[in-house]
Amino acid sequence: MATFKDACYHYKRLNKLNHAVLKLGVNDAWRPSPPTKYKGWCLDCCQHTDLTYCRGCSIYHVCQWCNQYGRCFLDDEPHLLRMRTFKNDITKEDLANLIDMYNVLFPVNQKIVNKFINNTKQHKCRNELVPQWYNHLLMPITLQSLSIELSGDIYYIFGYYDDMKNVNQTPFSFVNLIDIYDRLLLDDVNFNRMSFLPLVLQQEYAIRYFSKSRFISEEKRQINHSHFSINILENLHNPNFKIQITRNCSTMFGKWNEACTLVKDIGTYFEILKTSHVEFYDVSPRCRMFTQHKLKAVSKVIKPNYATSNHRALATEVYNCRWCSVNTSFIVWNDFRLRNICDNVLNFIRALVKSNTRIGHCSSQEQIHSYIRDVFDVCDENKWNTSVSGIFNCLESVELDGVHYVLLNHEVNWDVANVLIQNIGKIPQILTLNDVITALHSMIYDWFDIRYMRNTPTTTFTVDKLRQLCARRKIADYDSGLSDVE
């Protein structure tokens, strides 16, 4: 059983404040939720289990039980998860406020300990002090947290997470912030709590405390597209697709890291709860992460042999050719922008091949084919530059005064011609490597200009940022029919 979950269940009965704050979905009646996918720690109840995606940010970080309350660590409502979430630069005073909140919600004194022991002993065969029956009393106060970086902000979600060595398939990594506070002060807080426990339970408490307060922080994990809801990934190739998210909001004022201080003023806390409401947002999935996922999908299904072929048709419209026909039933081709990029890039590369080499048929096995797939993933700059340089080196360039040149005297389609005119000023007959790079960049940037894209989707924005974008009518970014250039 998860220690934090048990503590919330038992301490919820102490008073009105605890009943409001410590209410977890995992301790209530179960309701149906989306299928689970990843193994990790539920941020709401801190247990290690199968996770489903959060309705607030679309990241897998909530269990199927807690999902019914729809809480997200990015909410603007002072529920327990939000009050345990800190952002960016954390001070010693912030951590002191967190410890005070733990002491308010999970007090340990002689009266509390006796009450829980008496309640437990009312059941048959529970006269012994077995740790599993007193799990709620054995939750030490630590500065253990799960951390994630989103849109330049670093979030720390504090809690008591059991079994830290278990499988972690989430983008969250364990971070220990005890050095920002003070080891001796935290030891004193826990030794004081431990002194009220029976001797048998003190040993278990001490083991748990030191194992969770002296660990070495993990390396930061990189968030990627697979950490988001599968529903998003399945619909990315629909240009009109919008992600629907919900956020719990209230009239909560003050700095982000001061939310945990609200439990010290019960009256103010309940006044804020009266203003609680849910806000709905339809946001664009447009971001560097998902764009790279789409471009990689294109690179897997294209036919590099088209670059050495003589077909009159565009790359995505070739049929009945063993080497060049693409499977148009793949979902990736539902996005007309990806079709356009594929057609233009391969048309341009083919024009370069025909202008500079004697390769005459798509059945030829040429070295240049091995570089073509990577030319679509413009997000991976190093691999992309290597790919373009490899293609250029296969074109039998001519060196003049230390600069290599290639010819362009083969026909190109109208889209490619327009790209060359816009970026070079005309349709050139001689190109340098930089000209080739500029042209290929432009064909992709016309639709997906990653230079001006955020790394993660807007689902990872705070409520304040979402409201600002909504007010400026930029929450859905661009109309799907317009390119970045337009």
UniProtKB/Swiss-Prot annotation:
The short motif IKBKB-like degron (ILD) motif is annotated over 479-483
Annotated keywords: Host cytoplasm, Host cytoskeleton, Host-virus interaction, Inhibition of host innate immune response by virus, Inhibition of host IRF3 by virus, Inhibition of host IRF7 by virus, Inhibition of host NF-kappa-B by virus, Inhibition of host RLR pathway by virus, Interferon antiviral system evasion, Metal-binding, Phosphoprotein, RNA-binding, Viral immunoevasion
Q: Where is this region: Important for cytoskeleton localization?
A: 82-176
Zinc-binding domain: annotated segments: 42-79
Q: What is its main location?
A: host cell
* Compartmental location: Host cytoplasm, Host cytoskeleton
What does UniProt say on post-translational modification here? The C-terminal region is phosphorylated by host CKII/CSNK2A1. Phosphorylation of the DSGXS motif is essential for host NF-kappa-B inhibition.
Carries keyword Metal-binding? Answer: yes
RNA-binding, as annotated region: 1-81
Q: Which GO terms describe its biological process?
A: symbiont-mediated suppression of host cytoplasmic pattern recognition receptor signaling pathway via inhibition of IRF3 activity; symbiont-mediated suppression of host cytoplasmic pattern recognition receptor signaling pathway via inhibition of IRF7 activity; symbiont-mediated suppression of host NF-kappaB cascade
Any one GO CC term of this protein is:
host cytoskeleton
- A Pfam family the protein falls into: Rota_NS53
Instruction: Drop me one GO molecular function for this one.
Output: RNA binding
Renumbered to this chain, motif pLxIS motif spans: 480-483
Q: Where is this region: Interaction with host IRF3?
A: 317-486
Q: Where is the signal peptide?
A: none
Q: Could you tell me the superkingdom of the organism this chain comes from?
A: Viruses
Q: What is known of its domains?
A: The integrity of the zinc-binding domain in NSP1 is important for degradation of host IRF3.
Read off the HAMAP family from this record.
ROTA_NSP1
Q: What is the protein's quaternary organization?
A: Interacts (via C-terminus) with host IRF3; this interaction leads to IRF3 degradation. Interacts with host IRF7; this interaction leads to IRF7 degradation. Interacts with host CUL1 and CUL3. Interacts with host BTRC.
Q: Which family does it belong to?
A: Belongs to the rotavirus NSP1 family.
Briefly state the protein's biological role. Answer: Plays a role in the inhibition of host innate immunity by inducing the degradation of key host factors required to activate interferon production such as IRF3, IRF5 or IRF7. Associates with components of cullin RING ligases (CRLs) including CUL1 or CUL3, which are essential multisubunit ubiquitination complexes, to modulate their activities. Recognizes the host NF-kappa-B regulator BTRC through the presence of a DSGXS motif in the C-terminal substrate recognition domain.
Q: What is this protein called?
A: Non-structural protein 1
What organism is recorded for this protein?
Rotavirus A (strain RVA/Pig/Mexico/YM/1983/G11P9[7]) (RV-A)
